[in-house]
Amino acid sequence: MLGKIKSDFQQNLFQTRLTDLINLGHPLVKLAQEISWDKLEFEFGKLYSDQGRPSIPIRKIAGLLLLKEMFKESDESVVERWIENAYWQYFTGEDFFQTKQPFDPSEFVHFRKRLKEDGLEFLLSQTVALHPEAKNEKEVQIDTTVQEKNISFPTDAKLAKKVIDNCIKIAEKENVAQRQTYKRVSKQLLRDAYFGHHPKRKKKAIMARKKLRTIGKRLVRELERKLPGEVLQQYADEFEKYKKVLIQERGSKEKIYSLHEPQTACIAKGKAHKAYEFGTKVAVTRGRKTGIISSIKRFAGNPHDSKTLEESLAQSQRVRTQVGGTRPTIASTDRGFRGVTQVETTQIVIPKNTKESSRYKQEVARKRFRARAAIEPTISHLKRNHSLGLNFLKGVSGDVNNALLSGIGYNLKMRFNQIKAQIIHWLEFLIFVLASVFLKINLK
């Protein structure tokens, strides 16, 4: 059952009203007044049952989720900071200053799973609505990046060691008597596999890696022999994954780089400081003039950039039409998207080596592709100041949700900074007027 925040206009002798503590001209207060909380409650209220215990109010949990993404907090830290920050409490709909945690941080996990991709796209559309010009912007810029997964750097030795450890855990859980556990041996072999590039350690490291794989295969076969048929069926997918990890080579297709995140891909973007990144490919779509993100789409594996255009523009259209906007008519990209010139009604513009027919067209193209480079710092902000840089959420749904949430946080932070700039501008204007008046009085 959907819970609601009851507005309390009566004074309380033992509690302090937030409006008596905070500055009502603060940018976060202004931002809270601009967000359509009623629309969020109406849309997300459909996801709750009509029976059972009242849930956490949507204004509270959605507000905290927005604050978390704006200021790059974790599930735990945002709840802790909420207790000590009166502005954050006002943002989430409280009337009086609270001194206890609003809910357990694990509630964020359930809320994200409840919203899914459709709910987060609606939330993204509401952040686009805060920027009226963005929903009808004709030209957008598109680029791809890698959303890295929070996994250990994958090596054959480490993956084989994890397979061995997992087999030991399964044997202990199912009471299977193993001929040998290899706990001590595998630990030493993993150490021997370190620094295999050194000439004096190369031979030893190669032998250690081979031995770890041999032990892993041996333990998997032993479990397949000794486990009962019904139990073996439960672990069938796990054992297939272990076998694939233990036999994959350098040139193997669809390699597994993490046992707990098997969807992780290895992507090379040509960076000098980071040759390979392990995660998922994400396409970012931003407006040319406003800089607002209208689409941030996750893709499985490592598809060619041109293959991401159709779904990215479709998501941008869905997000913008939810707030009365239109589909972009022009999308400027880099040369990595070559091969596509039109996606439905959207023209794809790519830099060409051929000269334009006139000086004017040359200048228009030059300005367009200079402006397109602005998406690079946008991606940098998404990674450094929001959650796109390292994804801690589990599974494919975690990849999708984390990408969308980073875009939501970016759009909100943009509006927050705009409000802050407006306040500073009016203060400067007021100081200028007062200074002019005092100067005239002194001259008289």
What residue ranges belong to the model's regions?
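Charged, often Cys/His-bearing segments associated with DNA-binding zinc-finger transcription factors
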Residues: M1-I35, N417-K444
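Short, conserved catalytic/metal-binding motifs centered on acidic residues
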Residues: H26, L64, V78-V79, D104-F108, ...
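Basic, low-complexity intrinsically disordered segments
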Residues: Y48-P57, A62, E69-P132
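Active-site- or DNA-interface-adjacent structural scaffold in DNA-acting proteins
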Residues: D95-Q263
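Basic, amphipathic alpha-helical segments enriched in Lys/Arg and hydrophobic/aromatic residues
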Residues: L246, E363-K444
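Flexible, glycine/threonine-enriched loop-and-boundary segments that flank and lead into catalytic domains
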Residues: L259-A275
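Electropositive, glycine- and tryptophan-enriched low-complexity nucleic-acid-binding patches
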Residues: K271-V319
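Helix-centered, glycine/charged polyanion-binding patches within enzymatic domains
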Residues: T321-S397
